[in-house]
Swiss-Prot record:
Membrane topology value: Single-pass type I membrane protein
Protein name (record): Protein Vpu
Subunit structure as annotated in this protein's UniProt entry: Homopentamer. Interacts with host CD4 and BRTC; these interactions induce proteasomal degradation of CD4. Interacts with host BST2; this interaction leads to the degradation of host BST2. Interacts with host FBXW11. Interacts with host AP1M1; this interaction plays a role in the mistrafficking and subsequent degradation of host BST2. Interacts with host RANBP2; this interaction allows Vpu to down-regulate host BLM sumoylation.
Region (Disordered): 50-81
Keyword annotations of the record: AIDS, Apoptosis, Host membrane, Host-virus interaction, Inhibition of host innate immune response by virus, Inhibition of host tetherin by virus, Ion channel, Ion transport, Membrane, Phosphoprotein, Transmembrane, Transmembrane helix, Transport, Viral immunoevasion
Organism: Human immunodeficiency virus type 1 group M subtype B (isolate SF162)
Residues recorded with modification Phosphoserine: 53, 57
Gene designation per UniProt: vpu
Lineage, broadest ranks: Viruses, Riboviria, Pararnavirae, Artverviricota, Revtraviricetes
Amino acid sequence: MQPLQILAIVALVVAAIIAIVVWTIVYIEYRKILRQRKIDRLIDRITERAEDSGNESEGDQEELSALVERGHLAPWDVDDL
């Protein structure tokens, strides 16, 4: 094989690895956004029910606490220092 062909193959492999890493990060961030939207919807439902009935819905609160207490998706992504 000629050096140019070897260089082209190495470049394709490096580009593929970079693409996999980038799309993995995008997928993780997308999951975080979806989870946050679900939490926001639950908070809105709890607020609406509290305004309507005068007390908060315990079912929604339990679901919200289960989502919030699930912990960090990535242990290295801790912002509470």
